């Protein structure tokens, strides 16, 4: 599952954002922007993440430790009963990953080659270096309108540009005499691949201010159809039983000339917030309609997130925040591989908001994402068995976010 719900600094203060009326609501609660104070707002955010993604096979941990920065921008113009808005952000994907000590799939391939000869081949990996990145950029424009003093509607159109990159080098050493007996020749594999796609979608929302202290909101994002086109450079001097072997045999969607669908699913978000004196409590639910989307031909289950949080205004200029989010991705084990593994996670957040004047607001947030490590399941790729049930997939992320809003 590719979507990112963390679109601003406010998310890493308190991930329960859908039920709130804020400038960042351009992304979380677009209908709620119709209830902002009149004015023009410009909001900018930067999420700074330290990300470790790892695969452990036979006690050896292969990890990528990388920094990722994700900016986002929101603009709102509110006057009377109407607002217009825009959002530019990284809406899906993640960091650039570099596995300098290799990936599990290549080591599993060496094991398979060795098992073909009951260990006589002596196959071993002599080079195993991979890097890759998935990033989806969004531009969204829309508006909102107050139907009554309690109810508003909002909506917009969005454009998504998606990129998925993979670069890999692998070399194998083995006994050439035994290799010749089983038809194995050559040593080197190389792949440099780019997948790109563009798509459009829509966003619809409702906001209901039941009272001055109680607010409900709903948002629906339509699916975004993305047909990826792959351009790749690949070289190999390896053959098995007369058939050429390439890295694209292990990562078929990254083979040159392959066109494949990997859509962003429809998303339904529900939220509520309640002010109690100097406190605000909030809760939310997000549902990802993965089953209805075409996602590289893999049968994903629907995913969901549940979140809640609190905000405490302990002075006229300062507010403290904290929150929690649980994410069930819906990704089946068969989808886990060297290029991605969408495992379930829990997010813990806290932060501060500083508003020195009516025109300036600063937000600081920190978060820790704890993932539920899982093993994969065996698969057969072009007659080569890869026992991914032996691989433990894991992630760990720490985040510091900074946001600033200026009201004209």
Question: What do the predicted segments below correspond to?
Answer:
Residues 57-63, 89, 98-107, 156-158, ...:
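"Short basic amphipathic alpha-helical interaction patches in structured regions
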Residues 1-96, 341:
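N-terminal, post-signal peptide beta-strand-biased segments of exported outer-membrane/organellar beta-barrel
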Residues 203-408:
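Outer membrane beta-barrel transmembrane domains
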Residues 47-51, 89-91, 158-162, 284-288, ...:
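Short glycine-rich beta-strand segments
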Residues 100-126, 163-193, 228-257, 373-392:
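Solvent-exposed loop segments that connect transmembrane elements
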Residues 142-146, 150-209, 215-223:
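Aromatic- and glycine-enriched pocket-lining scaffold segments that form the walls
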Residues 71-146, 150-152:
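Hydrophobic alpha-helical hairpins/lids featuring a short glycine-rich hinge
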Residues 20-25, 62-68, 131-136, 192-200, ...:
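Short sequence motifs at beta-strands and strand-loop junctions characteristic
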């Amino acid at each position: 599952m590719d979507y990112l719900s963390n679109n601003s600094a406010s998310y890493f203060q308190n991930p329960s954002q859908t039920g709130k009326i804020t400038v960042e609501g351009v992304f979380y609660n677009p209908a709620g922007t119709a209830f902002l104070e009149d004015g023009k707002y410009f909001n900018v955010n930067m999420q700074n993440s330290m990300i470790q993604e790892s695969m452990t096979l036979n006690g050896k941990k292969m990890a990528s430790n990388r920094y990722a920065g994700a900016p986002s921008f929101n603009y709102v113009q509110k006057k009377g009963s109407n607002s217009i808005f825009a959002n530019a952000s990284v809406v899906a994907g993640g960091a650039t990953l570099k596995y300098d000590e290799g990936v599990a799939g290549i080591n599993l391939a060496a094991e398979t080659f060795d098992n073909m000869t009951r260990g006589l081949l002596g196959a071993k990996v002599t080079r195993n270096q991979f890097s890759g990145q998935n990033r989806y950029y969004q531009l969204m424009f829309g508006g909102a309108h107050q139907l009554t003093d309690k109810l508003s509607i909002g909506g917009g159109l969005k454009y998504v540009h998606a990129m998925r990159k993979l670069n890999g080098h692998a070399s194998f050493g083995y006994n050439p005499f035994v290799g010749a007996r089983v038809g194995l020749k050559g040593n080197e594999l190389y792949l440099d691949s780019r997948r790109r796609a563009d798509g459009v979608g829509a966003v619809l929302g409702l906001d209901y201010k039941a009272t001055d202290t109680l607010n409900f909101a709903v948002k629906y994002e339509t699916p975004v159809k993305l047909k990826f086109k792959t351009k790749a450079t690949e070289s190999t001097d390896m053959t098995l039983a007369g058939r050429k072997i390439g890295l694209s045999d292990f990562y078929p969607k990254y083979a040159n000339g392959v066109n494949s669908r990997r859509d962003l699913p429809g998303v339904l978000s529900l939220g509520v917030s309640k002010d109690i004196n100097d406190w605000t409590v909030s809760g939310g639910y997000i549902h990802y309609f993965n089953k209805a989307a075409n996602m590289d031909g893999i049968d994903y289950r629907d995913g969901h997130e549940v979140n809640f949080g609190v905000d405490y205004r302990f002075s006229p200029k300062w507010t403290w925040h904290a929150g929690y989010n649980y994410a069930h991705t819906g990704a089946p084990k068969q989808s886990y591989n060297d290029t991605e593994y969408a495992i379930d996670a829990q997010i813990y957040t806290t932060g501060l908001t500083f508003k020195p004047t009516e025109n300036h607001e600063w937000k600081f947030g920190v978060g820790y994402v704890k993932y539920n490590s899982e093993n994969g399941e065996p698969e057969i790729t072009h007659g080569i068995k890869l026992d991914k049930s032996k691989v433990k997939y894991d992630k760990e992320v720490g985040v510091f976010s900074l946001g600033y809003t200026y009201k004209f």
